[in-house]
């Protein structure tokens, strides 16, 4: 069953969502883009979709018509609108992917005329907050405004779920070492956050994040037990979660790492990250052996059955942030960064804060439509 979607906002996440639909067969087979809404001309949007300074050149064919207000990718045409008010957009779709960052309250998101609205940001009064692979079972048919949380919440939540299910977390504190975003200034300028007002490429910028507190909406038994902060750093993409926590049950470094290995090895599209094999295989790049075990196109063995499929992976090599650009996983746990000192434990995980989150938006869109 094809899902008809509209994308509101063609910034970093909106363009990532659009690109993923046409770049990954698993999505292009199931999702039809009916319309997008953005503030630029058709020519400008087409150019920014085609050429991306972080993710590289899009390999597909892109066309546009300025006077008729449409874009076309790989021969599939869709409408381009330039409306500021959601109620003025004639979507005619099943699901809206709200990627502007401007409509982060339920009363605002509900103004879209669609069965489902999935917001790419925390929405305190959303019908539900879904972190794909972690609390999918909380999604109900009647939920209309669905928050996908944030890129950081999507990294932290799978880690917390693995740890909490085995060790029972008592409390925790997260620091996200985060790439700069368009919410910061290239050079010093106006911003309500005086630190984000400063030049993003020249300093580490301490700032805020609600990612840790959002976990309480995703894993209710941890409500009020986690908090966190953020430091924006001078890189254009890929971030890291540094999570320190205490637990009811004691564990060694080796035991904690084994938990993540078991979780990742049970994922339906797991690939161990190595220096020799730093290539991210989308969900569709799989085949079945005669025994029924899935294999990647490179021959990497995978197993079935774990609910965090396609969201959790591990890394045991000494990699750096740029090695994870365009990585599809929500969290790649760096096993070399696990520590235990007395009652305090620490784990770290990488995430492509643009690409992986864009994919999770689409995963939730497919999941929500299956509930209709």
For the regions a language model picked out, list residue spans one by one:
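Structured loop/turn residues at secondary-structure junctions
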Residues: 10, 101, 151, 207, ...
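C-terminal active-site/capping subdomain that shapes the small-molecule cofactor and substrate pocket
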Residues: 2, 228, 240-265, 304-372
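General small-molecule cofactor/ligand-binding pocket signal
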Residues: 34, 79-81, 227, 312-315
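A cross-taxon signal for low-complexity, glycine/charged-rich
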Residues: 269-283, 287, 294, 301-304
């Amino acid at each position: 069953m094809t899902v008809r979607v509209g994308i509101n906002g063609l910034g970093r996440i909106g363009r990532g969502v659009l690109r993923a639909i046409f770049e990954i067969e698993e999505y292009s087979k199931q999702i039809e883009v009916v319309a997008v809404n953005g503030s630029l001309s058709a020519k400008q949007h087409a150019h920014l979709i085609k050429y991306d300074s972080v993710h590289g050149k899009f390999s597909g064919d892109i066309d546009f018509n300025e006077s008729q207000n449409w874009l076309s990718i790989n021969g599939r045409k869709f409408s381009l609108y330039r409306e500021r008010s959601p109620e003025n957009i004639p979507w005619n779709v099943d699901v809206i992917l709200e990627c502007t960052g401007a409509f982060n309250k339920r009363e605002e998101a509900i103004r879209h005329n669609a069965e489902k609205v999935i917001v790419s940001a925390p929405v305190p009064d959303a019908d539900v907050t879904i972190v794909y692979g972690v609390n999918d079972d909380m999604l109900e048919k009647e939920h209309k405004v669905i928050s996908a949380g944030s890129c950081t919440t999507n990294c932290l939540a799978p880690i917390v779920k693995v740890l909490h299910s085995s060790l029972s977390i008592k409390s925790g504190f997260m620091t996200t070492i985060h790439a700069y975003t368009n919410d910061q200034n290239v050079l010093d300028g106006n911003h309500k956050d005086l630190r984000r007002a400063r030049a993003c490429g020249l300093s580490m910028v301490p700032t805020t994040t609600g990612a840790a507190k959002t976990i309480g909406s995703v894993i209710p038994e941890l409500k009020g037990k986690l908090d966190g902060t953020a430091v924006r750093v001078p890189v254009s993409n890929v971030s890291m979660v540094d999570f320190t926590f205490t637990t009811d049950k004691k564990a060694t470094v080796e035991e904690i790492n084994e938990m993540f290995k078991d979780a990742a090895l049970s994922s339906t599209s797991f690939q161990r990250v190595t220096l020799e094999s730093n290539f991210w295989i989308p969900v569709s790049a799989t085949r079945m052996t005669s025994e029924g075990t899935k294999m990647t196109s490179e021959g990497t063995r995978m197993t079935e059955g774990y609910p965090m499929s396609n969201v959790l992976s591990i890394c045991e090599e000494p990699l750096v942030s740029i090695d994870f650009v365009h990585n599809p996983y929500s969290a790649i746990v760096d096993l070399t960064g696990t520590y235990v000192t007395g009652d305090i434990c620490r784990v770290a995980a990488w995430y492509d804060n643009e690409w992986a989150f864009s994919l999770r938006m689409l995963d939730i869109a497919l999941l929500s439509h299956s509930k209709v």
